[in-house]
Amino acid sequence: MSRTYFGTDGIRGAVGQAPITPDFVLRLGHAVGRVLKSQQTSPASRPTVLIGKDTRISGYMLESALEAGFASAGVDVLLTGPLPTPGVAYLTRALRLSLGVVISASHNPYGDNGIKFFSAKGEKLPDSWEQQVEATVEEAAQWVDSSGLGKARRLDDAQGRYIEFCKSTVAGELSLKGLKLVVDGAHGAAYQVAPAVFHELGAEVISIGCNPNGLNINDGFGATHPEALVSAVQAHQADYGIALDGDADRLQLVDATGRLYNGDELLYLMTLDRLAAEPSEDAAPSRVGVPGVVGTLMTNLAVEQALAARGVAFVRAKVGDRYVLEELLARGWQLGGEGSGHLIALDKHTTGDGLVSALQVLQAVVRSGRTLAQLLEGLTLFPQVLLNVRLQPGQDWKASAALAEAQRESLAELGERGRILIRPSGTEPLLRVMVEASDAALAQRCAQRMADAVRRA
């Protein structure tokens, strides 16, 4: 069953255009509240939801609309103010709440916003739940009596609680003293908590992208604009740089030389660190500590091959961290992620967390006594070209004869030296054309051929 409003990461769009309007968001809050109450085992109890947001100026408006919608359905609300998405997931679980809600459009510019939800366990909710919400949104509202209206209040020290949680995901004796770090908060949800986490663990911290004004989230800073981080690391002669996106659920990492490390490399490093912590080589055949790793259709082939060489199973999920999580839960595995920097370590958190992931990487560096580059010496990624082609309204790229022909030509040219992946974005009107090959020029040539075919269609 298709969904009208929900994409791969909640509901997202331009502010002021359906569905990111105050009236729809109020209806959405009301519908979600009704769904929550219908699932209660005890009708006498009242659900409580947690609402967090990033730093977009539209967050104030949408927060108020959601709050009103929930209250009108008889649901209580706790408000955190600006807080990373994984912080909302953590607090929802830690405080035994009914639902977590995040108002954010992640890495998108400030003119966009979105809403996503977490279960009481701090996990992203399945498609079936979203379909139930969409059906309820279309029904007539069922306002509760005044005596049954929900209440709203601010949650004290939400940021401090999350900071302590992040620190708890690494060994108690871990110290980052002696490390100079540049931390880029993307002018987003982590602008206060990110520098604090690393500072409290002993690092010298230089903050950039930590001065939000409501209009500058992701603007020239953050995980989608790592050039700012590279420049700052080199200017300050820092050891490493850490860039988060607007809601801090993913990261980019830079070393002292300015080299960028993507999510594929960091996922492999996290796997190596856990393998190194296994009690003996006798455990290698079963890999009790790391039986398998989940990537996506976009994960670099070199990672799959390197894991196989170490006896670690690898499975590809659909693109999107929610699908990585579903695969991990189904298999009982712990580690998964995407090249974009969404990394999941279920032994640490229930969802992807840029700060927690960065701490896992730094912990591996500190306790090994080696640099990040040295730890990854055995991994050489295949050249991968990703082109984003904007689709016109109503454009049916699947029916394009020109694209089909360009794809046939590219497959013939690649042979067994590479692979092709063409897929639409789940959040924007874009077609993503990815080619991975043993030769960079070959990958670029094939990707450009197919992208040009889409533009001509």
UniProtKB/Swiss-Prot annotation:
Where do the annotations place Mg(2+) binding? 106, 245, 247, 249
Reaction(s) the record says it catalyses:
alpha-D-glucosamine 1-phosphate = D-glucosamine 6-phosphate
Q: How is the cofactor bound?
A: Binds 1 Mg(2+) ion per subunit.
Active site residues of this protein: 106 (phosphoserine intermediate)
Among the GO molecular function terms of this UniProt record, one is: magnesium ion binding
Keyword set, alphabetical order = Isomerase, Magnesium, Metal-binding, Phosphoprotein
Q: Which residues carry this modification: Phosphoserine?
A: 106
* Keyword Phosphoprotein included in the entry's annotation: yes
Q: Which domain of life is it from?
A: Bacteria
Q: Does the keyword Phosphoprotein apply?
A: yes
GO terms for biological process, alphabetical? carbohydrate metabolic process; peptidoglycan biosynthetic process; UDP-N-acetylglucosamine biosynthetic process
Which principal EC class is assigned to this enzyme?
Answer: isomerase
UniProt-listed HAMAP family: GlmM_B (MF_01554_B)
Tell me, what does this protein do in biology?
A: Catalyzes the conversion of glucosamine-6-phosphate to glucosamine-1-phosphate.
Q: Which family does it belong to?
A: Belongs to the phosphohexose mutase family.
NCBIfam families from the UniProt entry: glmM, PRK10887.1
Entry protein name: Phosphoglucosamine mutase
Annotated source species: Methylibium petroleiphilum (strain ATCC BAA-1232 / LMG 22953 / PM1)
